[in-house]
Amino acid sequence: MALVAIEKVGQIGIAKETSPWELPSNVWSDGNNVKTDEGSIRKSPGFSEVMATCPIAPYHITQITLGSPEFWVVAGLAKIYCYDNTGTTTTLDGSITSVDTTITVDSTVGFEDVGTITIGSEDIVYTGKTATTFTGATVTESHSDGATVTRSTVWYDITRASGGDYSSTANDTWTSTILGGVLVMTNFYDKPQYWALTNGTVLSSQKMQDLNDWPALTALNGAITGTGVPSPDEIVVDSTLDFPTAGTFTVGTEDISYKGKTSTKFTGIGRGENGTTAATHLDDAAAFITTYCRSMRGFRSFLVALNIKQAGVNFPRVVKWSTEAATQTTPASWNETTSTVDAGEYELADTKGDIMDGMQLRDAFMIYKEDAAYSMTYVGTPFIFAFRQLSPTVGAIATNCIAEFDGGHAIFGKGNFYVNDGQRLKPILPQRLRDYVFTSIDGAQIDKCFVAADYGRTEILFCFTADGAASVEPNKAVVWNYITNTFTMKDIPNVAHMGYGNVGDPVLPSTWASASTSWATITGPWTMSYALQDKVLLFADPVSTKLYRDRSGNKKDTALMTSYVERTGLALNAQGQPDFTGVKRISAIYPKMSVNGSNSMTVYLGTSMSTEGGYDWKDAVLFNPDTQSKVSVRGTGKFYAVKFESSTDMDWELDGYALEIDNAGNRGSREY
C-alpha cells in the first residue's frame, strides 16, 4: 500500500467536460464557486448587499471619483441615480437651537453646496455653505457643541430634468465612459447623457443632461404658428450647421421634413411626418434630428459613437467621432461635413455584422462587430483616424463584452473567449470548457452577456445566463485568472452589470469593540483602512433590486453557498503511474488544506470499472483539518474520483491531497 500525492491542485483549475482520464492529475473535471490562488484551490468569496435600499432596478453601475465626494452611478431602464459613497462627517463648532439658521462646524469639505445634514435624530435642510458653515438651515431642535454632523441623503435622483424618463430596455441597456472627468452614458433609445462638472467635481444636485451638440441640434429663431406649411416655405433656426442638406428633424413631438437648407433656414417644408401630429412651436424651441447610438466610449479627447440610429433608420456599421473636447467639457461638434472641426464618420462595411462595442487599447481604439474586429488609430488631418481590420471573423457577442487588462482586451466572442493584444485575437478557452460554456448559454439571452475585470484579483469574469435559469439575467460566470491562466466557475445573483470601485465591506467589523469574532474565523483583511480602500466588483441585480459587494463574507448575501471541486477519471496506481487496466483499492484520502474556525469539509470517494460507466459514490465523510489528518474511505475500481465540498458559512483552501492506494490486480472492464 502506497501514499500517492497530488500537489498544486490550483495550477490549472477546472477543465469541465474534458474526458477526465486524459487530464493531468492536478486538474479538476468539475467544480463551482471556487477560485485558484497561488497554486491552490479555494472557495470563492461570498457577496453581501450594500448601499441599501437601491431605489431602482439596477441595470448598469459605474463609479466616478473626482476628489470628494465619491459617487456610484446606477442606471435603470427609466431613471439614473447616484449614491454618495463618501461617508462624510464633521463636528459642531458651538451649540445650536431651533432659532438658528446658520450652523458652524469644523469643516464642510465633502458636503454638498445645497443638501441635508443629520445631527442626532434630526434631518436639517440647508441652502448654502461656506468653508465652516451651513447657511439657510431649518433647525427644530437644540444640539450641543461637538455633536457629530453627517450627510443625510445617500441616494439622489439625477435623471435628466427635461426630456422625461429614459426608454432603455433590458436587452439594450447602458454603456458608460469618462472623458476629461465627465461621465457620459448612452442606451440606444435615448440621446446620450452626460453629468456636468461644477468647479471640477460632480454634485448630486446636478442632473444628467442630453449631450451637448450631439447631432444635430439647433433652436427655432421665431415661433411656428399653425399646423400647415409656413409661408414663405421655410423655417428659420439659429444654425443648420450639423444638419444634412435634406431630411427630417423633430420639434417637440412633431417630425418636420425639409428638402434644402441655407446656413439658418430649412426650406421645402413638410409637416407632421412619420405619423406625428403637426403643432405650434414657440420661439427658441429645440429642433433636432433624433440620433442614438448603441455604445459611446472616450478615446484620447474624442467621444466615439458606435452603431448609429438616426431619424428611425439604423446604420449598424457606422462609427462617428466628435471633435476634440477641452478638459472637463463635452465636445463642441459632431459635424463631419465641415473642415473646421475634427469630427467625422466611417462605415466598417467589409463585413455584414453590426458594431457591438469598442474600447481604447493603449494608443488605439478597438472596435468589435459581431463578426470582425478593427483598430482605429489617430493620424491627424485631414482623415483624423485610420481604420485597419484585425480579424474578419472574430468579434464580440454583445455590448459590454470587453474588459481591458494588462495583456490587452478580454472579449466574450461567439464561440470562444479571446484576448486582443493589439495585433491579433487569440482564443483562450480550452476546447472542452468552450463546449460546455457555449452549450450552457441560454440562446434567447445572448444580448445580456457581459465581461467584468477584477484587477485586485487579476481575474476576468465572463458572465452569461445559463440555459434553464430561473431569471433572464446572467447567473453564471467563468472566471479567468490572467496571470496564472486558470479557469474556474462561480454563481452570480441575476446580475445585469458589474462595476469596479471602492465600497466598504458590511461583513467586517468597523471597530475593535464591535468585533464579535476571532482571528481564526474572520475572512477579511486585518487592516480596516485597506478594506475600505481596496477596490472590488459591485453586482447590479435588477431582479431583487439590490447591489452586492463581491468578496464579502462566505455566503450568497444571506443564503448559504455550496462550493465544490470534483475530479473523476483518476487512474494512478500505487506507483503513482497512470494505469487504465489495473484495479486499485483506495483506503484513505489525506487532504492538505485549511479552514476558518472549527468548520468541516465534506469529502467523497467514487469508483468506476470503466470510462463508460458511472461512479459509485461512497457515503460523505466530514473532515476537519484542525483535528484530523485523513479521511478513511473504502472503494475499489479501475478509475476513481474525489470530491471536496462545503455548504456552510465557511472559508477553505486546498493545497493538495494524497491517496492511500493498493494495486488489486486486473479484472474485466465492462460494466453490466
Please annotate each region the language model reported.
Residues M1-T86, Y156-R160, D165-G181, G353, ...:
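Beta-sheet repeat architectures centered on beta-propellers
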Residues P45-H60, D157-T169, L203-A216, T290-C449:
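Beta-propeller and closely related beta-pinwheel folds
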Residues F71-T86, D123-V125, A131-G136, D190-K207, ...:
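Short, surface-exposed terminal/edge motifs of secreted or surface/virion proteins that either
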Residues A75-L77, N187, T253, N307, ...:
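Structural signature of WD-repeat beta-propellers
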Residues I80-N85, T153, P192-T198, A311-S339, ...:
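Short beta-strand segments and strand-loop junctions that repeat across beta-rich extracellular domains
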Residues N85-G94, N199-A216, G501-T517:
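Internal, charge-rich low-complexity segments
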Residues N85-S152, K207-A286:
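Autoprocessing Asn-cyclization modules and mimics
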Residues T173-P215, M296:
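Hydrophobic or amphipathic alpha-helical targeting/insertion segments
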